[in-house]
């Protein structure tokens, strides 16, 4: 068991100095076993080190110079490991200093190469076996290492292991324990007001179409509230108390600072009741009427006369305007002509593109198309629009009552269904007329309205 190191006291130093002086005065050599008997509790080794390292006069302290190293190497070659004679040959160092400096620095058998993992493992195993008895460990360590080198290497390995353990413990605690200020996040419903890009680029203020996006949890309640509000608005708009007419409420010409931006606000009530008495008697309002219900009282005009006259148009003021390059619906007969009695004239407007997708052929003409129930003037009761067997007529031309009417032949029987796609550009006034006419059909219509400037889509379900 290793002894506990104790500091030398002043009394112990006095006793050691007195014993050394007595031996020197009598001319006796310094026998440290005999001198240690004069200092209770101290060994011969303790007394020798204390004398030569601290109390002896003329002993050099600190690093060795090159001349001292050369004298030490020569003395060891001559006297071996007799450190007393080596110390006398050196003259500036005591025997302990000579022994320590030779074994730790100048011994040619010392290994100064890098430590390998196997050598580290052998050192740790030796410490487990011999504790910190570095003299015993150095005697059996391969390759040869000094006691100081073994001690320093063990201190380095222990410090490295402690740092790794602390780092792993810190990481484990950070994973297992959440931060003190940690709060679980919850989904919060927000009302986000969407502003179309047209407002930014055009600089005309708020856009008339505001889309309110809400969370899924509030959609059901909001739908009920919106239905109630729309029912109240429809009661005010009807005025006459007729519950069968579910006409849409359309606001046109929203403006900022008195400038009409051509936007449309549409409020539609989802109802299956037909809005027009002319169509109420039909069992299938969405089915197109057969050919027999359209009029055939117009004269034939060759197709070439329409295709070549790029400046001829038909002025239509109630529904919409068609311009050169439009597609219209007509029958395809062998003569290459269509039935029409429309008078047309030239006018200027913004080009549009209307594509009526159906099984019947298309001809490119410069005119407008109108579909509305015909009046009962000059007709018998059997052909009146309000009867079950007579659907409304299709008219091509202006809104005058004297305009000839043209029918479209080639359609199938009354029970057939058709899917019609229309692509057009219109103004606010034209949009109001279009929405009124479509709402009166009493069928489900999906309409996609885009803002022309920035292509911002808005879908309305009628």
From Swiss-Prot:
Disulfide bonds: none annotated. Pfam families: Myb_DNA-binding. It comes from the Eukaryota. Residues 32-52, 83-106, 134-158 bind DNA. It is found in: Nucleus. Its main location: nucleus. Residues 374-385, 396-408 have a biased composition (Polar residues). Residues 159-175 have a biased composition (Basic and acidic residues). The keyword Transcription regulation applies. Keywords: DNA-binding, Nucleus, Repeat, Transcription, Transcription regulation. SUPFAM superfamilies: Homeodomain-like. Residues 159-184, 216-262, 374-408 are annotated as: Disordered. Transmembrane segments: none annotated. Residues 1-54, 56-110, 113-162 form the HTH myb-type domain. Residues 216-235 have a biased composition (Acidic residues). InterPro entries: Homeodomain-like_sf, Myb_dom, MYB_TF, SANT/Myb. Myb-like transcriptional regulator; part of the gene cluster that mediates the biosynthesis of the phthalide-terpenoid hybrid 11'-O-desmethylfendlerol. This is Myb-like transcriptional regulator mfmK. It comes from Annulohypoxylon moriforme (Filamentous fungus).
């Amino acid at each position: 068991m290793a002894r506990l190191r104790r500091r030398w006291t002043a009394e112990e130093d006095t006793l050691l100095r007195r014993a050394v002086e007595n031996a020197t005065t009598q001319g006796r050599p310094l026998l440290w076993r005999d001198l240690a008997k004069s200092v209770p509790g101290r060994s011969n080794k303790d007394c020798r080190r204390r004398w030569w390292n601290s109390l002896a006069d003329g002993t050099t302290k600190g690093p060795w110079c090159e001349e001292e190293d050369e004298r030490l190497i020569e003395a060891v070659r001559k006297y071996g490991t007799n450190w007393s004679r080596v110390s006398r040959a050196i003259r500036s160092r005591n025997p302990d200093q000579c022994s320590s400096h030779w074994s730790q620095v100048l011994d040619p058998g010392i290994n100064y190469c890098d430590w390998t993992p196997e050598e580290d493992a052998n050192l740790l195993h030796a410490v487990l076996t011999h504790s910190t008895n570095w003299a015993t460990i150095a005697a059996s360590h391969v390759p040869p290492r000094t006691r100081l080198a073994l001690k320093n290497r063990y201190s380095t390995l222990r410090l490295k292991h402690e740092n790794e353990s602390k780092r792993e413990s810190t990481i484990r605690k950070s994973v297992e324990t959440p931060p003190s200020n940690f709060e679980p996040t919850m989904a919060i419903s927000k009302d986000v007001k969407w502003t179309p890009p047209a407002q930014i680029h055009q600089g005309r203020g708020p856009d008339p179409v505001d889309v309110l996006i809400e969370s899924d949890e509030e959609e059901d309640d909001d739908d009920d509230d919106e239905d109630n509000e729309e029912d109240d608005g429809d009661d005010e708009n009807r005025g006459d108390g007729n519950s069968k007419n579910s006409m849409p409420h359309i606001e046109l010409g929203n403006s900022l600072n008195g400038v009409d931006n051509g936007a449309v606000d549409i409020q539609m009530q989802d109802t299956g009741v037909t809005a027009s008495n002319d169509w109420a008697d039909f069992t299938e309002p969405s089915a197109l009427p057969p050919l027999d219900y359209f009029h055939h009282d117009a004269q034939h005009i060759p197709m070439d006369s329409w295709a070549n006259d790029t400046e001829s148009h038909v002025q239509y003021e109630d529904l919409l305007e068609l311009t050169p390059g439009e597609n219209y619906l007509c029958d395809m007969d062998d003569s290459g002509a269509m039935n029409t009695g429309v008078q047309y004239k030239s006018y200027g407007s913004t080009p549009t593109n209307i594509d009526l997708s159906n099984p019947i052929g298309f001809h490119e003409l410069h005119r407008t198309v109108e579909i509305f129930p015909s009046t009962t003037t000059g007709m018998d009761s059997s052909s009146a629009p309000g009867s079950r067997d007579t659907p409304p007529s299709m008219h091509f031309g202006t809104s005058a009552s004297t305009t000839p009417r043209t029918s479209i032949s080639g359609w199938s029987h009354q029970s057939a269904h058709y899917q019609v796609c229309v692509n057009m550009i219109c103004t606010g006034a034209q949009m109001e007329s279009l929405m009124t006419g479509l709402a009166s059909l009493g069928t489900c219509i999906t309409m996609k309205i885009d803002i022309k400037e920035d292509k911002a889509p808005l879908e309305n379900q009628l």
